[in-house]
Regions:
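Acidic, surface-exposed loops and disordered segments
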Residues: 1-168
């Protein structure tokens, strides 16, 4: 489980007689990005060693239980889990969103994206239809509509506040 951790920095601040500030949005962003960057480096190393990986966002379904289980102090929260292992099969890799849709140079220009996303939707539909397990019929953009078209983990705001991430 990869955690955003401000408790260490707070202890360092106190160690030097400082008065730590808590709850600022920037601190939340920095600690979350740090956890994600660390995890991504673990993933790169694992995949280079032939391991398969799967990020597990479900640790945020009940973060209080995860916090208790892992004995996390205030100013620490679980961002996601990560499963590592040697695959017992060789599944076809899921096609990724084209880099031309993700990468922006010098300014944000999405004028060509709709056509590229529609093309990607067809690639994803074909992938889901052809894969051996858990076939789906939804396109990628339909999945995004499902994710953004509903409230997701509304308990996180209160949980984060209780952990010291108040978003000032």
């Amino acid at each position: 489980v990869f955690c955003a951790d401000l408790s260490r920095s707070i202890r360092c601040c106190k160690m030097h007689g400082g008065v730590p500030t808590e709850g600022f949005t920037e601190q939340f962003i920095i600690s979350t990005v740090d956890a994600a960057l660390y995890a991504q480096n673990v993933v790169i190393a694992a995949e280079s060693a032939g391991l398969g990986i799967c990020y597990i966002g479900a640790v945020r379904n009940d973060p209080a239980q995860v916090t208790a289980l892992l004995n996390l102090p205030k100013n620490v929260y679980p961002v996601f889990g990560l499963c590592l292992g040697y695959p017992d099969q060789n599944p076809e890799p899921k096609p990724r969103l084209p880099i031309s849709v993700i990468l922006k140079e010098n300014s944000y220009d999405s004028s060509e994206e709709d056509a590229q996303i529609k093309d990607y939707d067809e690639v994803v539909r074909t992938y889901y239809a052809m894969r051996s397990g858990n076939p789906k019929s939804q396109s990628w953009s339909e999945q995004m509509t499902g994710l953004l078209g509903k409230e997701s983990r509304p308990h996180m705001r209160d949980y984060l506040s209780q952990q010291g991430f108040e978003m000032k």
